[in-house]
Regions:
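Accessory RNA-recognition modules of RNA-modification enzymes
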Residues: 1-225, 230-237
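Short hydrophobic/aromatic beta-strand or adjacent loop that forms the aromatic wall/cage
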Residues: 36, 284-289
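Short beta-strand element of the conserved SAM-dependent methyltransferase core
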Residues: 100, 288-291
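Active-site beta-strand termini and strand-to-loop segments that position acidic
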Residues: 140, 291-292
Length: 292
């Protein structure tokens, strides 16, 4: 069993960020905490893709995943997987949600019958409900939100809590905040509960091709952004022309963070950059940054 708390692991992983202007100590998340994991299936085999390969390694337990996911993995792996596709397994606050995406448009009756025997909240196939025993729920503080099939969540609860606290602290003193690429509201509800006048965007607005314009941004003195791996180049281009005084940028891709940071530096100074190891056992990092 690999020790993800070892000095060797941490030294090797942090070395991948050697060229970044990091201002604070890295935050390390333990293994066994992932609440969402992407699996693959093909030719009846369910598991993870082998590194740099299209071959699938069968999986019935994952030391990186939380106990709730590992409890159902053997049964999920044993489903009659026809065709090929991807499976997102998510541990919601009240149980497990399974979202299948596949080029095969419809699930078989055999798959439906087998899925009905799983101890899960819901199984969907290309967004169509196969089985639903209850509505999946995720909580952000005191707020309970219905979880749509395949929706984004921070990969770990502890990581989400840490980032949320960092965002609230970095926004201190601001009055009106915009939470862009807000997803289900990991930061939105926390900022609202802390007394900020907060608006969320990104659920229905394509911020990649239709970013908030300067006129829209000028209503706010703080902007929070947590874009997907592609980053937020269009939105950053608008921000540097605006009157927004503070940008809190959370990134899951150091490469696009570097690109976007160069744009933001046309107007702002980098105040802090802290790496968070939410993706234990991989080369990926989460970055928390504040520009002002």
């Amino acid at each position: 069993k690999y020790d993800f708390t070892s000095p060797d692991y941490r030294a090797q992983k942090i070395s991948e960020l050697a060229r970044l202007p990091i201002t604070g100590d890295a935050v390390w998340i333990d293994a066994g905490t992932r609440r969402r994991a992407d699996f693959a299936f093909a030719d009846g085999v369910f598991g993870f893709y082998q590194h740099r390969s299209k071959a699938i390694v069968p999986v019935r337990c994952c030391p990186l995943c939380c106990a709730a996911i590992n409890d159902v993995l053997p049964a999920v792996a044993s489903l009659p997987w026809g065709g090929a596709g991807a499976v997102l397994v998510t541990a919601c606050d009240n149980g497990i949600d399974i979202a299948v995406t596949s080029a095969v448009p419809y699930f078989s009756s055999e798959f439906k019958n087998a899925a009905a025997r799983l101890d899960v909240l819901r199984v969907t196939w290309n967004g169509r409900v196969v089985v639903q025993n209850a509505t999946p729920i995720v909580k952000f503080g005191d707020v309970s939100v219905e979880y749509p099939p395949g929706a984004f969540l921070q990969p770990t609860i502890v990581g989400a809590d840490i980032l949320r606290d960092m965002v609230v602290a970095a926004a201190a003193g601001a009055h009106r905040c915009a939470d862009l690429f807000c997803g289900l509201g990991n930061f939105t509800y926390a900022l609202g509960a802390d007394g900020f006048d907060i608006a969320g965007a990104g659920v229905r607005r394509d911020l990649f091709h239709n970013p908030l314009t300067v006129g829209m941004l000028n209503k706010y003195d703080c902007v929070v952004m947590d874009p997907p791996r592609a980053g937020a180049i269009a939105q950053c281009t608008e921000l540097v022309k605006s009157n927004v005084g503070r940008v809190i940028y959370i990134s899951c891709n150091p490469q696009t963070w570097v690109r976007d940071a160069e744009i933001l530096k046309q107007k702002y100074s980098l105040v802090s950059l802290v790496p968070v190891d939410q993706f234990v056992g991989s080369a990926h990092w989460e970055l928390f940054s504040l520009f002002a």
